[in-house]
Amino acid sequence: MVAPKIRIKLRGFDHKALDQSASKIVDTVRRTGADVSGPVPLPTRIRRFTVLRSPFKYKDSREHFEIRTHNRLVDIMNPTKKTIDSLMTLDLPTGVDIEIKTVGGRA
């Protein structure tokens, strides 16, 4: 049977806060004795918006804005009860979205 695995996806606009959160998660998992893979940087999603500067005329004058969404992936192999408890109490900075999935079955 496949060993249990926890997959954590981190998303955020600030890559420094994202890397800091990923390193906190990796340190916590290693302290509890589970194996960790990552953080793996996933492709950054760039959303661009073009807006007219003037409300009435001067269509040639436009402004460009963009939002960059950075992504990281952390896999935890063979998590223990202690690992899950320590991840639940972990304090992470605001602005980081966390998605946690369990992959695989119980051994």
UniProtKB/Swiss-Prot annotation:
GO biological process: translation
Pfam families: Ribosomal_S10
Gene Ontology cellular component terms for the protein in this record: ribonucleoprotein complex; ribosome
Keywords on record: Ribonucleoprotein, Ribosomal protein
Superkingdom assignment: Bacteria
Keyword Ribosomal protein: yes
PROSITE patterns per the UniProt record, alphabetical: RIBOSOMAL_S10
GO terms for MF: structural constituent of ribosome; tRNA binding
Matching InterPro entries: Ribosomal_uS10 (IPR001848), Ribosomal_uS10_CS (IPR018268), Ribosomal_uS10_dom (IPR027486), Ribosomal_uS10_dom_sf (IPR036838)
Keyword Ribonucleoprotein assigned: yes
SUPFAM superfamilies: Ribosomal protein S10
Primary role: Involved in the binding of tRNA to the ribosomes.
Quaternary structure (record): Part of the 30S ribosomal subunit.
Family to which this protein belongs: Belongs to the universal ribosomal protein uS10 family.
Record's protein name: Small ribosomal subunit protein uS10
Lineage start: Bacteria, Thermotogati, Deinococcota, Deinococci, Deinococcales
Gene that produces this protein: rpsJ
